[in-house]
Each structure stands twice: as C-alpha cells, then as structure tokens.
Design a protein with these regions (language model features):
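Conserved N-terminal boundary motif of the eukaryotic protein kinase catalytic domain
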Residues: 25-33
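ATP-binding pocket architecture of kinase catalytic cores
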Residues: 33-150
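Active-site acidic catalytic loop and adjacent metal/ATP-binding pocket
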Residues: 37-48, 54-55, 59, 93, ...
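Short, glycine/acidic-enriched loop or turn micro-motifs at the edges of active sites
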Residues: 64, 114, 200-202, 220, ...
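A glycine-centered beta->alpha junction motif in the catalytic cores
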Residues: 65, 109-121, 143, 163-164, ...
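Active-site activation/catalytic loop segments of kinase-like enzymes and analogous catalytic loops
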Residues: 227-259, 271-289
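ATP/Mg2+ or Mg2+-diphosphate-binding catalytic cores
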Residues: 244, 255, 277-317
Length: 317
C-alpha cells in the first residue's frame, strides 16, 4: 500500500507575500486543497486577516518539484487573466509573483469561490449538459497561441501516455496500440484555434446544484481545437457515469455553441489515449452510485475508445 503524503505547507516568506497581496496583516489558517494523499499540494486555501479585523479567503498556487512546473503556475495565471477579460466563470487573479523575487518561488493568488467540486456518485442529464455548456463558453473565445498559452494537441498536454507506450515506458494492449495507429494515420483535423481549459473533469468544476459556477485549475490551459476540451470531458464523464453520459455532454456543448461539434470521434480517441493503460485511482461509479474498481473504470475507457474507433473514418488506401 502506498504511504500517504503529509502535506507540506507554504513557508513564512510565501505567506507574508500572500497576506500583502490583499493588504492583510497575517495568514490565520492554511488548508491544502489537493485531492491526492500521495503527492504534495501546490494549491492552498488561505484565510488572511485584513483591515478592521475582517478575514479574506484566497487560493495560493505554487509549483511542486517534478510535478507542477513553474510554467504551469504561470499558465494558470495567464489563463485567469484571459478568462476575466472575456467574462468567463473562473477565479480572478489577485496577485502574481512570476519570477519569485518577492515570495521566494513562483506564486499566484486568486479568489476563493463557493461551490463544490466533489464528484456526485449519480448525475443528472441536466448536469452533464451544463458541463458541456460550461466548456463551450471557454471554447467560444477564438485565440492563437501566445506566451504562456501554447498550442495543445491533447488534454493535459504535459502528459503523453500514447508516446510513453510507444517507447516501452508503459505497458500497452492491442486496443490501445490499434487506436494509436489509427489516430496517427488519420491526421489532425483542421479547425479554428480557440481558448482551451486543458484539463476538464468534474474535480475542476465548481457546482451549486446542477449549475456550474466556475472552472478552476487552469495550469494546462492553452489554445487549439475545441475537441481537445470536449473529448476530454466526454471521456471523463464516460469513465465516471457510463457510456450514456458523453451524449448529454455533447448536447450541452452544441446547444451553447450554436453549432455541431466536428471530428468528435477523433478527439474522443485522443483523450482516451492520453490515459494510463490501467486506470488505477481514476473515479467511476456504477448505476447505483457505488464506486468502481480500476478494472471496471479501465473497461469503461476501453468501451469509450472502441466507440470512437468505430466512428472514426477509415483512410482511403
């Protein structure tokens, strides 16, 4: 059994910088917001004492060696600025120390938002449609690559699981190998470059009932085909809630976008290929809401991938 990780809290220099970012006097409490028990946290909720003894809650983000790179914290900050410019539902950037001179590390401070990112064991079609619509609002921003918001060819672009399998760094299966060959021979579809969240799943969405109030954690944001985000969300919902869920996500996305999504099977396959061969630790729920084990979640990934391959156009030889 893996040993649980004890969260390492930010040091005094970082906390002093954070307090000064909201004209506060001191940090009253620090809480890790990480969902992982086996990795250190790079995201913290701070309660800061401010003028007239009023407390302010904010979110601090810092890098973690060999996991959350400096560039990812900087990308998150740039994405939040862009989200605010376009009126998107996301935290607002309060302060950023992108060279680490003031805080001793790359660090950002953003607003703390209400809402829950907990994954419900059962989900309504309305919530799935709302999730699709939330992503479509981001993808409505036409955008070319720029500093700190690079082109993204797949979700969570810092990972490339398909390449790891090709190089023998991770075991593969006949299905994953066939899918990788099909996707590579298909070629990347052409589409307008848009703003991408880059890591869309239930844990990066804040909810009040069936209303998505914000997308959070933009550290792999960038630009590219909207299918990167849509395929990622469709796959995540298939993993969590079964093979009927992606259709509701697509319906919500298309209704919000006012148009049909393109190359859906291709981007579904790309998303499925950028997952570990065995889906250990990935959440999924049975129809009765009971949690699924890794084998069952892996089979859901494989079923989603098979459907994508069945719908992917076969190249003319």
């Amino acid at each position: 059994m893996a040993k649980a990780h004890t969260a390492k809290m930010p040091n005094d220099q970082v906390l002093r910088w954070a307090a000064s970012g909201v004209d506060g006097t001191r940090v009253l409490s620090t809480e890790s917001l990480s969902r992982s028990d086996h990795r250190p946290s790079g995201t913290f909720r701070l309660r800061i004492e401010g003028p007239a003894a009023r407390a302010t809650d904010v979110v601090l983000k810092v890098p973690i060696p060999r996991w959350i790179l400096n560039a990812m914290v900087i990308t998150n900050a740039r994405a939040l600025q862009l989200a605010e410019t376009h009126g998107l539902a996301a935290p607002r950037l309060i302060a950023a120390d992108l060279d680490g001179r003031a805080s001793g590390t790359v660090a950002t401070l953003e607003t703390f938002l209400s809402g829950s990112a907990d994954l419900p064991p059962m989900v309504s079609a309305a919530r799935l449609r709302e999730a699709g619509a939330a992503v479509a609002r981001v993808n409505a921003v036409v955008l070319e690559s720029q500093a700190d918001l690079p082109h993204r060819a797949r979700p969570i672009a810092v990972d490339d699981r398909a390449a790891e399998r090709r190089r023998g760094w991770m075991p593969t299966t006949p299905l994953l190998q066939q899918a990788d060959e099909r996707v590579r021979s298909h070629g990347v579809p052409g589409a307008a470059s848009v703003f991408l969240h880059g890591d869309v799943w239930g844990g990066n969405m804040l909810w009040e009932d069936d209303r998505c109030v914000a997308l959070i954690d933009w550290k792999t944001a960038g630009v590219g085909d909207p299918g990167v985000d849509l395929g990622s969300l469709r796959m995540q919902m298939a993993l969590q809630y079964g093979q009927d869920a992606p259709a509701h996500v697509l319906e919500g996305w298309q209704r919000q976008a006012g148009r049909a999504a393109t190359a859906v099977p291709y981007w579904d396959a790309v998303a499925a290929l950028n997952t570990p061969t065995v889906m250990q630790g990935w959440p999924g729920f049975a129809d009765d809401g009971s949690p699924l084990d890794a084998a069952a979640v892996t089979e859901r990934r494989d079923a989603f991938l098979r459907t994508a391959l069945d719908q992917l156009p076969t190249p003319i030889s």
